[in-house]
């Protein structure tokens, strides 16, 4: 449901829009925390260490995904507010293509560099295998994270921050049950926790896609909307990259902290 942000009580509109957005950003951080809590309780200290050793990397990648997709939503919001719906739809298409490209590049780079990342973190040998399996599966789920974050970004661009939050809250709860199912019932260990996480992320993204395809007619792309434009791609990248990289800068301190903790925890 689109909402005009230029009509009505400004304070009320901002609060209604901002609160789900803030809570949603917090919820996205809970995937790894939930995994760690359940893994620690069921599988023990070494399994917990395997998940915890990679948490900063997971937050780093997630932060970049959130940032770049939020940036892609800014030009979409601009043209929605200007009531230039044709231009807005073309930007949605261009943003989708760029997001797909980012998914391929980021996933490939993270998977290829997975071993090197764990070596940089100084992950001990006794937890290395489980840590590798966990973070590799998380990396393979990057496209699902980008799917949710891009679709939620364009929903927020037309004033709807509530729908993405509802789906994210559902996915966070679902992640708990999937963790228990994959770890307790299927006996998949740390890998099961990662599979549960990316499955929950995928479902939240698919739910957003269903809402857009069924109810958000103003976002339905026609034949004339589905073409790449250099100007659109440049504007999207000029917004997306600067919002993605500052997030990386903030998360790097956590990465350094994780490395120090792992080193300090060695016997």
What is the predicted function of each stretch?
Residues 241-267:
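The Walker A/P-loop phosphate-binding site
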Residues 21-74, 138-145, 234-242:
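Transmembrane helix-bundle signature of multi-pass secondary active exporters and lipid flippases
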Residues 19, 35, 72, 113-114, ...:
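Hydrophobic/aromatic residues in alpha-helical transmembrane segments
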Residues 1-18, 76-141, 185-238:
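Short alpha-helical transmembrane segments in multi-pass integral membrane proteins
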Residues 99, 154-177, 195-198:
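Alpha-helical transmembrane segments of multi-pass membrane transporters/permeases
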Residues 48-108, 145-164:
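Small-residue-rich hydrophobic transmembrane alpha-helices
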Residues 60-63, 175-180, 205-209:
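Hydrophobic transmembrane alpha-helices of multi-pass small-molecule transporters
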Residues 23, 35-39, 51, 76-81, ...:
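Hydrophobic/aromatic residues within transmembrane alpha-helices of membrane transport systems
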């Amino acid at each position: 449901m689109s909402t005009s942000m230029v009509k009505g009580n400004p304070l009320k509109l901002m609060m209604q829009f901002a609160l789900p957005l803030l809570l949603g950003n917090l919820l996205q951080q809970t995937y790894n925390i939930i995994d760690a809590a359940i893994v620690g309780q069921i599988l023990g200290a070494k399994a917990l260490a395997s998940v915890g050793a990679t948490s900063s990397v997971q937050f780093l990648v997630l932060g970049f995904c959130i940032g770049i997709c939020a940036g892609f939503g800014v030009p979409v919001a601009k043209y929605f507010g200007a009531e230039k719906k044709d231009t807005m739809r073309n930007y949605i298409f261009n943003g989708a293509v760029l997001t797909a490209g980012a998914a391929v590049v980021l996933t490939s780079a993270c998977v290829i560099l997975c071993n090197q990342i764990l070596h940089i973190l100084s992950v001990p040998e006794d937890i290395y295998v489980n840590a590798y399996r966990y973070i590799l599966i998380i990396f393979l789920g990057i496209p699902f994270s980008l799917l949710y974050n891009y679709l939620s970004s364009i929903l927020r661009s037309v004033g709807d921050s509530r729908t993405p939050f509802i789906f994210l809250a559902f996915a966070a709860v679902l992640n708990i049950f999937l963790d228990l199912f994959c770890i307790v019932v299927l006996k998949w260990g740390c890998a099961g926790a990662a599979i549960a996480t990316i499955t929950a992320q995928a479902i939240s993204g698919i739910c957003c896609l269903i809402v857009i395809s069924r109810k958000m007619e103003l976002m339905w792309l026609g034949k004339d909307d589905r073409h790449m434009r250099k100007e659109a791609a440049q504007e999207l990248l000029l917004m997306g990259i600067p919002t993605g990289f500052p997030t990386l800068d903030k998360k790097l301190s956590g990465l350094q902290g994780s490395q120090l903790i792992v080193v300090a925890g060695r016997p």
